[in-house]
Structures are given as C-alpha cells and as structure tokens.
Amino acid sequence: MAELLKVNNITKTFGGIVAVNNLSFEIHEGETVGFIGPNGAGKSTVVNVLSGYLNADSGQVEMNGVNITKMKPYQRAHMGLARTYQIPRPFPELTALASVATSALCGKKRVNQSFEDAMVEATHYLEFVGLFSKRAILARDLTFYELRMLELARSLATTPKLLFIDEVMAGLNPGEARNAIQLIARAKEQFGITIFWIEHVMAVLMESADRIIAINYGEKLAEGTPEEVVNNEAVIEAYLGRGWKAYA
C-alpha cells in the first residue's frame, strides 16, 4: 500500500510541558489505523498538529509526499484531509442540509462549485448517514447521535482521502455505536478513504483497525496489529490494565 501520511519526529510543547515528543509513524492508503493512549497521553495534540490547528515545534508532516507541516487547516482540507470532533461542532443555526453543503464547499474538488450544487450533493451524504428525513431541521435541534452522524456527513462531504475520527463512540448507546461502526466501514469501502481512528473503546478497534498505534506521554509505546498491541506489556501497564483480556 502506498504511503499516504508520514509523520517525522514531531514535537509539541506547551511551556515546560512536552505534549508530543519526537513522534514518528506512517499511514498507508486504505488502512484503518487506531490511535490509543490514556487520558493526557497527547492524542488530541497529535491530531491537532496533523490537521493544522496547532504548529509543531519541530518535525515534519507529509501527505502524498508533500510537506504540509506549515499548511493551514483549509489547505490540508484541499489536500484531502478531514476530521470529526469528539464534541460535535455544528453550525447551530443552519439546517442539517445547509451544514453539509457548507462543508462540501471546503473539500479538495470544490473550485468554483456553487452553493446550489453543494446542496444537491449534500443530500446524498445525509442519505448515507441516515439523516435525509432531518435535512430541514436546525442542527441545534438534533439529538446527540444525530449530531454525531451530521459530523460524519460533513467530513465525508469534503471528499477526503484521509479521515481522522475522534472518539465517535463516546456518549452512544450500544445500538447507536453498532450503527456508527457499520456506517464507518461502509464509508471506507464506498468512498475509498483511509481512516485514522482515535478511540477509547478497544473492542471497536479490535474489530475495525488494521493496525494500532499506542502512545503515552507523547511518545510511541507500541505499534502493530490489534492483537500485538493489546498484548504488549507496556500498553497493558500504561493503558489497558491487568484486567484486560489478552488475545492469543
């Protein structure tokens, strides 16, 4: 598989606190890569650096061989990078349809696209996530699960090559979580996207991820298949705990 994203020795500090320390890894086209670690491990900082919301102190990020380290978030979106947020960030005064259409205008194939065309395209993404019947409802009036799905529709509408998913299972009941897992799997297959998935629900990554990267204190603890990572002693000690049932 071709290399899609390459992270080279990135470091990020906040005052005297080292949030990310000389971290390197790669993501290849077509993969689902899980990203785990205890609270405060630096996961959110890594995602914010990779998506352009924070600047790394040192190191380099490449996408498709292009150095994107200094690019703004909108420039990275044009390169094909999209993300969801752990806490949904809707446009509260826009309808679900207008919210997705607005995001569609930010993607990598949107030069000179009209808002009317974006609205038409947005209907397809709302149908995909099961929100077509809610298209005329303001985002502020959607349920929490519906906001999660709206967030996914908005990210897909940018036609990403690489999608960062940030703890999409948080706050969902078992039925909603199952629907979300199946929907993400369908999105990967139907739209040909690569996924970098930050998640605390390990059972989800055991089912969905091709590889998992574990970090703690901003440094890589382990990297490998889900089975290899959950059986790694450093990961068990720092994150999973001794009560975790290892996979043979």
Label every model-predicted segment.
Residues 2-248:
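Glycine-rich phosphate-binding loops of nucleotide-dependent enzymes
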